Regions:
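N-terminal targeting or signal-anchor segments and their processing/structural boundaries
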Residues: 2-655
């Protein structure tokens, strides 16, 4: 009896265990993995559409796509775009194996519509991408199939722009960019690439637009734009491409020749920019300490603001230190009676952009500024510091000790590091902590030869805009040693503070420590400015090309890059464009090679500015694409087989 019960229990346990294993295998099957079998690497397959893909005379506004497995649509708002553009965003819903797109705008008669999903469609379990997919239909008798493709780059640094709209207008006058939505539209990917599909034969102009308000037209200076004067005539021809079938990562099986239709143009280059004269507004005014307050603006202006003091004369009591474009301005109070006030009351008139018209206008605001640290608090802190010093002196006196420590007081401070060595073509700069006058008789530049120091000629120049910044110009010679000496009280501020004595030794590096670079630019004219870059944002040197050359001397050894731009207005800086004036941003070029410069070496390079398209000019090290994971299938089964072979070989070695 016990034997029967035992055998019966074992039989049932065995069945239950087998069922559990089957269940675990079934649960593990989706996607499989190490090591429940091969991975699922098959992308989703489209089984059918309603209306039929490529259908004609379609009137319904609901589109249904059915796939062979459950799917997902990734970042639909960013990746999916309907052309002609829809002012009211279409609704995209996913349910299992089905995608439903509802077009909410009325359909235009006799028009080809495309729904470009880019690479957004993936299977729901493993995320295998379907690849770039576009659904299309026509509301008329004809389906337009032409395509226009290219890239969009930032005009100032040739960085590919992701997510900007690129559109076509069949009306060729400039005004349509501001007054009408695009006829056809696409959106760029992370590489700045776009492909506008469903284009009918005809003549077009192309535009790019970072559409801030969703109306598919250029609305204002805050929107990044690009435009081309070229008239585009789409065309096509039969072509072939070659597809290599690989056995593994090293060996290939065969090369297939695949016929396809080649659409032109396929290499448009649009350089996008924000217009010069961006909307200007007063961002904030801050008064952290009694002595000064600072105004911050969102954009530069050629016109400096004015202060109309309430209860004081701004013209005689304020000193102004500003940036070159008047976007940051600091006002120093030099009247001691004004400093003692807790509240500074004034009217401030400045140039701003009118919200309704977008035009520059003068605006006046009234302010009452109270410093975070009031003068009363400042005086209390000084009194407390003096009291501590006096007590310390008293303790030292009682111990019979003397002290050389001076009583606490405010001094004019120097900032700006003077390097121990300097190139012969550089100069010394320093910044003072507060507005001051300088007695140059108390400043000495000493040339040291052996152990003898002699006065060397120099020139001290205050900055044109920043009244705290100074430059010391000298007759520097390679290999020489100097000492800059500033006597005590040579600097006296508007608050009657003086400087402590200051000295700094430095040397002029010998020629052997530097590299030189000579760049031959056959297409250069007098408008070309060539920049030597230490990084994308750091301009090390800048010269204007002369006689087809740009020469750089006294370069510290290191890695560098070259950028150039056409300085048409001769202001030594890159300038943006203006659409209404038909003015493009100044053209930028990059030298495609990275330069490794060594000490005591002269390097010569020849640079043909237009030898490469913009997409291939920028050195790899400077390319700063917003890397998004490319939606391509992974060969995980190949990886799995390699891992299994690796483990097998390991077991054989151990055995």
């Amino acid at each position: 009896m016990l034997s029967y019960i035992y055998n019966n229990v074992c039989r049932h346990i065995g069945k239950a265990w087998g069922f559990l294993l089957l269940l675990m295998a079934a649960c593990a099957n989706p996607g499989a993995g190490p090591d429940g079998g091969p991975y699922d690497e098959t992308p989703p397959m489209l089984l059918g559409t309603s209306p039929q893909m490529g259908g004609r005379n379609i009137g319904g506004q609901k589109i249904t796509l059915v796939f062979n497995e459950a799917i997902q649509v990734e970042n639909a708002v960013e990746k999916v775009i309907v052309s002609p553009p829809q002012v009211e965003m279409p609704e995209i819903k996913v349910s299992g194996r089905r995608i439903t797109v509802s077009l909410l705008d009325s359909l235009k008669p006799g028009t080809t519509y495309t729904v470009d999903f880019s690479d957004a469609i993936k299977d729901a379990t493993e995320g295998n991408p379907m690849g770039n997919f576009t659904y299309y239909f026509s509301t008329g008798e004809t389906v337009d199939t032409m395509e226009v493709a290219g890239h969009v780059f930032a005009a100032d640094n040739l960085t590919p722009i992701k997510g900007i709209l690129v559109g076509l207008h069949s009306a060729l006058e400039d005004s349509v960019f501001r007054t009408r939505p695009f006829d056809r539209v696409a959106r760029t990917n992370a590489e700045g690439f776009f492909s506008i599909k469903g284009v009918s034969p005809g003549r077009y102009r192309a535009y790019a637009l970072m559409d801030m308000d969703g109306d598919f037209r250029f609305s204002g200076k805050g929107e990044m734009i690009a435009f081309s004067r070229e008239i585009i005539t789409p065309s096509s021809f039969p072509d072939v491409r070659h597809d290599t079938l690989w056995v593994d990562s090293v060996r290939y099986d065969s090369v297939r020749v695949i016929p396809y239709t080649h659409y032109l143009p396929d290499n448009l280059e649009l350089r996008a920019f924000k217009e010069a004269g961006q909307p200007r507004a007063l961002l904030k005014i801050m008064r952290d300490v009694p002595e000064k307050f600072t105004a911050y603006f969102t954009a530069p202006s050629a016109q400096a603001p004015t202060v109309n003091g309430i209860g004081f004369d701004a013209a005689t009591t304020l000193l102004e230190s500003r940036s070159q474009g008047n976007d940051t301005i600091t006002y120093w109070l030099r009247d001691t009676a004004l400093l003692a006030r807790d509240t500074l009351h004034f009217a401030y008139t400045y140039e701003a952009t009118d919200d309704s018209t977008g035009l520059a206008c003068l605006r006046t605001d009234t302010f009452e500024l109270v410093p975070k640290l009031t003068m009363a608090r400042r005086l209390k802190q000084k009194a407390e510091a003096m009291e501590r010093w006096q007590k310390q002196q008293e303790r030292l006196r009682k111990r019979g000790k003397s002290s050389t420590e001076e009583p606490p007081r405010d001094y004019v401070k120097f900032s700006g590091r003077i390097r121990s060595s300097m190139a012969p073509d550089r100069n010394l700069t320093f910044t003072l902590s507060e507005p001051s006058s300088i007695d140059t008789a108390g400043i000495h530049l000493l040339l040291t030869v052996d152990s003898t120091k002699t006065e060397a000629p120099f020139r001290l120049v205050r900055d044109k805009y920043d009244l705290l910044r100074y430059t010391v110009y000298g007759e520097w010679r390679p290999g020489q040693r100097y000492e800059l000496v500033i006597d005590s009280a040579a600097v006296r501020s508007i608050y009657d503070n003086v400087n402590k004595p200051f000295s700094q030794t430095f040397s002029i590096s010998p020629n052997e420590e530097f590299a030189a670079l000579f760049v031959h630019v056959p297409q250069a004219d007098t408008s070309l400015v060539v920049q030597l870059l230490a990084s994308e944002t750091k301009v090390e040197r800048q010269v204007r090309a002369k006689s087809g050359r740009a020469d750089f001397y006294y370069i510290e050894p290191g890695t560098y890059y070259l950028r150039a731009f056409r300085d048409f207005n001769n202001n030594q800086r890159w300038d943006s464009g203006l659409f209404d004036e038909g003015l493009q941003a100044e053209t930028v070029y990059y030298f495609p090679k990275t330069l490794k410069l060594r000490a005591n070496w002269d390097i010569e390079e020849t640079w043909h500015l237009d030898a490469l398209p913009a997409a291939r000019q920028k050195p790899t090290e400077l390319q700063n694409l917003q890397k998004e994971r490319k939606q391509t299938g992974r060969s995980r089964n190949s990886e799995r087989m390699r891992e299994k072979a690796k483990q097998s070989n390991k077991r054989l070695r151990q055995g």
